[in-house]
């Protein structure tokens, strides 16, 4: 029973989305149209990207890159700034979740004896991962979903995301100046360093790296709409199964199931004319504001899926759920990853972490939302 309770707590968003889907079935009983609710191309592409990224993680690629870069810095501020910026840019390519899973354990190990610096750096890394991930379609699940669901042209996507991303980078560059400066002591090994199989031959590792690179390249081509997602799925499965089938166990299937539950929930609500008109009336013309506010309560990935069924304004919805990833601890599930990693470390000061997290996140949220609101007004 304790294992079940632990699993439910760990996957709370999945079970909330499942409950929402089941309740919505009261209004629209199960029928064959349910299959049409699900955006299979988005789910397939998301699976492919996660499998490719987890493949690189399984051979220690990200940990080695992070370790190589961090050895070049000798003060807490310069190292902290480097880690924050690494999170920002890495998230654009491998998602906000993966950048945090790679760099937060390293940060905790490096700053274990400096609790104030550790907290501030992890808080800023979390903000950096969420903000950097907004720049690209594959940076986070909500971006990939909106980009795919609304068939956004690549140029339009970057036109929307690059200005707030640039402002976010400026905010982060100012924020890292608040990391105290002191001399670094010798770092300890990260607790959660990636597993590289003992005794793995150089030739075998190179083959695995090549196969995971091929999977990533095919996934990127699919993001750019150069390949059909079904072709991508087959190629990625062949590459991963050939390289290391255990990588498939690392894929976040709970996230995929969460998407399916919300697809059913939104589809069922949309099938009821009165409900569809009511929600559409609230969302229409306020996509960014509603996206920001709703993300604070249910997190930005479910928010993107839910609101997409009631608006055609992909650009403002995209801005709302990306900027809305700042704020509360649950606004972005990636933020919970950092909190769990830090909270599990020796001597963790969770109350201090929560206070700093809230202060930095809400400050950045207010600045970005105000700036984007002003930009929208000028562009109208």
Question: What are these language model-derived features?
Answer:
Residues 4-10, 32-42, 152-164, 201-204, ...:
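Interfacial loop-to-helix junctions that mark the boundaries of transmembrane helices
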Residues 1-16, 75-76, 201-211:
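N-terminal membrane topogenic signal
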Residues 2, 116, 155-203, 336-380:
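Juxtamembrane and boundary regions of transmembrane helices in multi-pass small-molecule transporters
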Residues 2-33, 44-60, 178-181, 218-246, ...:
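Structural signal for alpha-helical transmembrane segments and their membrane-water exit/capping regions
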Residues 37, 59, 63-66, 213-312:
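Transmembrane helical segments that form the transport core of multi-pass membrane transport proteins
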């Amino acid at each position: 029973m304790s294992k079940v309770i632990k699993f439910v707590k760990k996957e709370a968003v999945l079970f909330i989305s499942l409950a929402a889907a089941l309740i919505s079935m009261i209004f629209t009983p199960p029928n064959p149209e349910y299959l049409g609710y699900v955006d299979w191309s988005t789910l397939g592409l998301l699976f492919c990207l996660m499998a490719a990224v987890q493949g690189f993680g399984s051979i220690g690629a990200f940990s080695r890159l992070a370790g190589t870069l961090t050895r070049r810095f000798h003060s807490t501020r310069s190292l902290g700034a480097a880690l924050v910026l690494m999170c920002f840019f890495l998230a654009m390519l491998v998602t906000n979740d993966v950048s945090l899973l790679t760099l937060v354990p390293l940060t905790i190990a490096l700053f274990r004896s400096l609790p104030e610096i550790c907290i501030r750096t992890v808080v800023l890394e979390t903000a950096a991962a969420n903000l950097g991930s907004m720049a690209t379609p594959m940076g986070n699940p909500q971006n990939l979903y909106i980009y795919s669901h609304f068939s956004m042209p690549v140029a339009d996507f970057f036109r929307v995301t690059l200005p707030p991303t640039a402002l976010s980078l400026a905010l982060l560059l100012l924020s890292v100046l608040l990391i105290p400066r002191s001399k670094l002591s010798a770092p300890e090994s990260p607790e959660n360093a990636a597993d590289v199989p003992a005794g793995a031959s150089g030739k075998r590792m190179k083959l695995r790296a090549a196969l995971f690179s091929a999977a990533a390249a095919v996934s990127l081509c699919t993001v750019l709409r150069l390949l059909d997602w079904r072709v991508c799925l087959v190629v990625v499965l062949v590459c991963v199964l050939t390289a290391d089938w255990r990588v498939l166990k690392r894929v976040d299937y709970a996230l995929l199931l969460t998407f399916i539950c919300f697809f059913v929930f939104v589809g069922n609500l949309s099938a009821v004319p009165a409900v569809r008109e009511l929600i559409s009336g609230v969302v229409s013309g306020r996509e960014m504001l509603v996206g920001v506010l709703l993300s604070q309560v249910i997190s930005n990935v479910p928010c993107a899926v839910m609101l997409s069924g009631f608006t055609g304004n992909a650009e403002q919805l995209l801005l709302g759920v990306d900027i809305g990833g700042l704020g509360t601890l649950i606004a972005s599930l990636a933020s919970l990853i950092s909190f769990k990693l830090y909270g599990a470390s020796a001597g963790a000061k969770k109350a201090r972490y929560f206070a700093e997290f809230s202060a930095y996140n809400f400050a950045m949220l207010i600045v970005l939302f105000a700036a984007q609101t002003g930009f929208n007004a000028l562009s109208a």
